[in-house]
Structures are given as structure tokens and as C-alpha cells.
């Protein structure tokens, strides 16, 4: 068992991973678009199959898990992160932008991440 889980851009996941992450009480979803599409993995054949999501198998299906906290839109395409914020959801925190560039430029972001996952407000 882990005290905290930090999700990166884990867009394609199995139902097992989705359930494990969303059932954990302290998750930091660092990138929008995490947990977006349900896949099935066949380790014997070394294949990954899209089960649901990305408008499949029906055009109206976006998030493959119908996840109430999907924050893909509008945040996935904000790569500048000029006003990056963390906001709380039922089992953790999410961000309001795609922080790839900001992580390379901001030393304070790592401190913010540490404070969120450890519950330290300072």
C-alpha cells in the first residue's frame, strides 16, 4: 500500500488499474487526460486493445470509463500553464493544465507536488 500515488499522463489503462487508482484516497493527477481510455492487455500476444474511449465503440463515448472527474477538456491543451492550479476531487488533486514544460522550468512546482501528496500546507 502506498501513502500517495502520482499519476502522469496515464491515458490508456485497464479496468483493474482504473479501479485501483480511483479507489486510492490520495492521488495527484498531474496531467489532464489521465484514465481516459479503457484497454485490455494480452501479455502472451504482446498486444494492447482499445476497449472503450476516444469515440469507440460509439461516437458519443469520449472517456472510456465515463469518469466523473475526467478533466481532459478544457485542460489537456493548455501547455503554457500560465495559471496552473491544483484543485481537489474526491480522492485527491488535479491540475488545470498540461505541465510538461512547467516542470522543466519551475523548481517550486516540485515543492508544491511534495506538499500536496504529504498533506503539508507550508
Where does each model-flagged region fall?
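Histidine-centered active-site loop/cap adjacent to the catalytic His
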Residues: 97-122
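Short, well-ordered secondary-structure micro-motifs within conserved domains or adaptor modules
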Residues: 2-10
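A glycine-rich, often tryptophan-bearing local segment used as a flexible ligand/cofactor-contacting loop or short
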Residues: 12-97
Amino acid at each position: 500500500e502506498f501513502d500517495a500515488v502520482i499519476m502522469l499522463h496515464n491515458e490508456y489503462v485497464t479496468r483493474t488499474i482504473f479501479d485501483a487508482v480511483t479507489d486510492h484516497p490520495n492521488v495527484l493527477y498531474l496531467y489532464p487526460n489521465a484514465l481516459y481510455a479503457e484497454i485490455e492487455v494480452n501479455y502472451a500476444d504482446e498486444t494492447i486493445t482499445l476497449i472503450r474511449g476516444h469515440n469507440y465503440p460509439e461516437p458519443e463515448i469520449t472517456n472510456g470509463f465515463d469518469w466523473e472527474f475526467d478533466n481532459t477538456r478544457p485542460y489537456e491543451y493548455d501547455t503554457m500553464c500560465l495559471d496552473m492550479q491544483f484543485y481537489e476531487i474526491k480522492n485527491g488533486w488535479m491540475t488545470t493544465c498540461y505541465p510538461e514544460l512547467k516542470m522543466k522550468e519551475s523548481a517550486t512546482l516540485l515543492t508544491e507536488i511534495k506538499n500536496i501528496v504529504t498533506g503539508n500546507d507550508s
